[in-house]
Each structure stands twice: as C-alpha cells, then as structure tokens.
Amino acid sequence: MKILVLNAGSSSQKSCLYDLEFLPGHPPQPIWQAGIDWTVNPDYAVLTVKAQGIKQEINLSSQDRPAGIARMLDTLVTGETKVVANLADISIVGHRVVHGGTEYSQATMITPQVKETIKKLIPLAPSHNPAHLEGIEAIEQVLGDVPQVAVFDTAFHRSIPPESSLYPIPYQWSELGIRRYGFHGTSHQYCSQRAAELLGKPLESLKMVICHLGNGASLSAVKGGKSIDTTMGFTPLEGLMMGTRSGSIDPGILIYLEREYQYNPDSLNSLLNKESGLKGISGISGDMRAITTAMAEGNERAKLAFEMYIHRLKSLIGSMIASLEGLDVLVFTAGIGENSALVREKASQGWSFFGLELDLAKNAARPRDEDIASETSKVRVMVIATAEDWAIARECWHLSP
C-alpha cells in the first residue's frame, strides 16, 4: 500500500510517501520526501525533493499553492525522483489538520461535511486550516476520488475532562466554543505509545508527561494512554514560553496596552506570536541554538531568556504531574526536546525529591528513542524522535477501505 502524507503549515508544505506491505512496529523510512517553502522569495517558492538517494531543488514560478502541490506530486512520477509508475498507484492520502474543534476525537475519512467543518474552524486556526483545505482540494484535482484522511492535532486532547478544558470565565462563553483544545496531539499520542513500547510496559499502566519542545511547544499529561491535561489552550499561544510566542501571560496586560497605548488586536496578535518568547527576551532569535551560543559568549539577555524558558517549562511540568497525581515517565521530543542536551538536563534538575535522576552521560550522547534516566531513577526519562508523518500514515493504514 502506497500512503501519501501531506503536512501543511502556514508558509510551507511537507509531504512524504510510504510503501508498505505490512504495518511495521517502528517508523520506516519514506521512499520519497518533499517540501515547499513559500517564504524564500515573494515571487517564487522553492520545492525540495529527496528520493532514490537524490536531492533536488526546484524554483516554482508561482506562489499559487494548488499549482505548487501539483508540481510537487509530479516529481513522484517523473525525473530522477520518480518512485511510482502512476499517481493512481497511491492508495490513500493522509493530512495533518491543526484544528478539528470539538467535532473529532479521532482520525476521520474526509467527506464534504468534514471539509465544511475544517472551513468553519478557520477563525480558530487562520494560518493553518485554509492551507489544509487547499491541500485536500489539490489532491482532489490531481488524484480524483482517492480516499483522504484527516488527522487532527486537537483530537487526542478531546479526552481532557471539563475541569481542565474549560476556562473560569462566564459559562456562556464556552457555548461559543471558547475552551481549551490543545495541540500537537498527533505527536503527544505517538510519543506516549512509543515510550511504552520501548519500556516494554502496558500503556494503560503509565502516567507520562510528554514535552513537545519545538519552535512551538506544549506539554501533555497522559494517563493510561489518554490525554487528561495539556498546556496549549484555545489557541497555540497559551502555555510554555516558546521560540517567538509568549505563552501564558496575565490577560490584563493586553487590556492595559489597548487602553493606555492604543495597541489594536492585530498588532498584539503579531507581537505575542512572532516577537515574544525567546526572541522577545533575548533580542537575538527564537532559535534555541542561537540562544545557547549567545549564552556561551556571555550575552546576559540570552541567559535570561534561557532561564525563563527553563523556569516556565519546569513549572508546567509540575502542573502536569499534579494532574496525573504521580509520574512514571518524562518524555522529551521535537526539535529542542530531541536535540538540546542542555535543555533536557536543566529541565530534569530539582526533581530528586520525586525520585527522578538523569544519567548525564546518556543525555549527552545524542540519544534517540532511548531512556536517559539513571539506573536508580524511579522516573524514566525518554528521548523520543517524534514521527507525526508516520503517525498519520498509520492512521491511514487502519482506515483504508
């Protein structure tokens, strides 16, 4: 079975193709990978394709998304990156969809009704849901009636109970859809399953905190394989300090800025999402690698940004542990979680009262899908390579007609 996965961002489009005869226990390598970056130049986009040991870069003459996706799919069947004889050989297509609202608690075959729901939720995910719809419609144009599956970032968190998912605001606001949805659900679910598998323990028996630390970052409290709490909320702006996002702040700050300094909603939205977090405090970058480099050079604001990041991370790990009423496994994943030994080390300090102890040598040895806790630690600490594309492909396998 050939499974195509599309993962659309606000300014990029990633895709890969898996060729499966059976469902393996661990993530296989896709036979083809591609990505489109629409931010390189206002006049054109850059398509990068990897297949058959070859990497190609192609400038696309248009910023038109459907045309770009069609050109990307063309590299599956033509040129040096050809891996299938005909696009009709693709059995099913899976899409990452950021926001599924309260309607979907699991992956779903895409129908006109599902498309309408994704469209209806655009106000809650204005940068992403339109891109997902464009991807779905581009596949319809190029591949016709091939089955398509939507895998929602919010679905895994539908199990969060009302005491955590609702805000302490006038109750009627919740009837307007204002509630905590949570995001990164596909990653959180995959990592919890993978951690249990690597530890050789039943998922149902474990209490885990999953730390998805990338440019966007969130934690989830996973009990018995179900999400019971998370740090992102109504939008991906809530929770942890992130690369360029503020995370949780006193909402009174926004009222003050609007009233006293005439800030408007659009400018506040831009500042909180794109000019805050590590970038806002350091004045350097939202990239953790740039922050740690500047720290090593003695930059005090970079040091402050890092210390704030760790403080807020540890505070919210504590919040997740409180929701779980205990902890068996702490998992680090995504760009920072997988690659920054320093972040993992600092985030794991101070928990000795809880029986958590890191093995510093293992932590520094570029671990991947490994337990980096000491032998005597009562809490296991895992580094899991997130595999959202594979998780989407796996859902397609299970839903395939």
Curated annotation (Swiss-Prot):
Q: In which pathway does it act?
A: Metabolic intermediate biosynthesis; acetyl-CoA biosynthesis; acetyl-CoA from acetate: step 1/2
Query: What Gene Ontology cellular-component terms does the record carry?
Result: cytoplasm
Q: Fetch the Pfam families from UniProt.
A: Acetate_kinase
> What cofactor does this chain's UniProt record say it requires?
Mg(2+); Mn(2+)
GO terms for molecular function, please? acetate kinase activity; ATP binding; magnesium ion binding
Q: What is its EC number?
A: 2.7.2.1
Origin: domain of life: Bacteria
Q: Name one GO biological process term.
A: acetate metabolic process
Cofactor note, please?
A: Mg(2+). Can also accept Mn(2+).
Q: Which reaction does it catalyse?
A: acetate + ATP = acetyl phosphate + ADP
Annotated ATP binding sites: 14, 212-216, 287-289, 335-339
Subcellular location(s) of the protein: Cytoplasm
Q: Which InterPro entries match?
A: Ac/propionate_kinase, Aliphatic_acid_kin_short-chain, Aliphatic_acid_kinase_CS, ATPase_NBD
Q: Which family does it belong to?
A: Belongs to the acetokinase family.
| Protein function | Catalyzes the formation of acetyl phosphate from acetate and ATP. Can also catalyze the reverse reaction.
Oligomeric state and interaction partners are given as: Homodimer.
Q: What is this protein called?
A: Acetate kinase
Source organism per UniProt: Microcystis aeruginosa (strain NIES-843 / IAM M-2473)
The gene for this chain is: ackA
